Amino acid sequence: MSDSPVTLPESIKLTEYSHGAGCGCKISPKVLSTILASQLPVFTDPNLLVGNQSRDDAAVYKLNDDIGIISTTDFFMPIVDDPFTFGRIAATNAISDIYAMGGTPIMAIAILGWPINKLPAEVAQQVVDGGRQACMEAGIMLAGGHSIDAPEPIFGLAVTGQIALTDLKQNDTAKAGDRLYLTKPIGIGILTTAQKQKKLQDEDSHIAVNAMCQLNTIGTTIAKISGVNALTDVTGFGLAGHLLEMCQGAKLTAKLKFDAVPLLPRALDYLALGCVPGGTHRNYDSYGEHLPELSEHQKAILCDPQTSGGLLVAVSAEAEAELIALLDAHHIAPICIGSLETPTTEANVVLY
């Protein structure tokens, strides 16, 4: 899966040291709402432009009338066995939140939890090097970090970015009539579960890895299109979950064309083998009441937790051609997967 600098014994498989995998480790939206319901008095700062209120991808702090600072963190347990690749994926996923706001990353620090009595330090070194590789690809330094002795391997980054406030994109600012586009196919949770269940064929091992290692750098350019009204990345809550956040924040309903949702190669084959991650069921349990009646097949795709997934874009009809041209120029299939409308039903997402 990678050109790791050190060859590991065949007996070391990182996914066997964790109970979860990637963004599928995320606490469910329902439980997270309980955790974040603070009992303390409300404290506000007028310069905090984006905080917890909108469940956005990162926090944004206004430095002056022109520039804002973006701050985010993301970490998880191994989603692949190879340590270098795990570190690279975890870092790519963390950096994505900066691009999802329309910003540019400027620095990162590492977060490492390591079972020092179970796994050699040399393995952790490869994980950190994978993270360093992703940072280099994003043009930033891995400037430091913090580590603890932990029962399971954990790795990720805290990332700082900057943004011209005129380019800032949020997940709750979509408008009725916007078209929906997705920059990466769905199915990462299915394929990584196939690996964990030892069903993944060797010739398919690169499919999810290549997708997860692809930086969402295009987000910085997408944000410069004035007709892009909302932007977010699709990660652990699945396409349906992150689309719901977009709908609920803007008080809109999404008309989603299920058959247009792009899927990773072989995802349907492994889905037929029962490779459904636990995160899929947790996701549906958390927000299924806001969805139309779904078949098990539809649930498995729409609620599939993504790790380092693509960007979900809401763009006006007037700016759609500009977005399509940009996606084409970056060799991303410009497939419209739906639209946003003024609500006419109780469900926030309807299928057609």
Swiss-Prot record:
One of its GO terms (molecular function) is selenide, water dikinase activity. It comes from the Bacteria. GO terms for biological process: selenocysteine biosynthetic process. The active site is at C23. SUPFAM superfamilies: PurM C-terminal domain-like, PurM N-terminal domain-like. It comes from Shewanella baltica (strain OS185). One of its GO terms (cellular component) is cytoplasm. It catalyses: hydrogenselenide + ATP + H2O = selenophosphate + AMP + phosphate + 2 H(+). The record marks K26 as: Important for catalytic activity. The lineage of its organism: Bacteria, Pseudomonadati, Pseudomonadota, Gammaproteobacteria, Alteromonadales. InterPro entries: PurM-like_C_dom, PurM-like_C_sf, PurM-like_N, PurM-like_N_sf, SelD_I, SPS/SelD. Gene3D superfamilies: PurM-like C-terminal domain, PurM-like, N-terminal domain. PANTHER family: INACTIVE SELENIDE, WATER DIKINASE-LIKE PROTEIN-RELATED, SELENIDE, WATER DIKINASE. This is Selenide, water dikinase. Mg(2+) binds at D57, D97, D233.
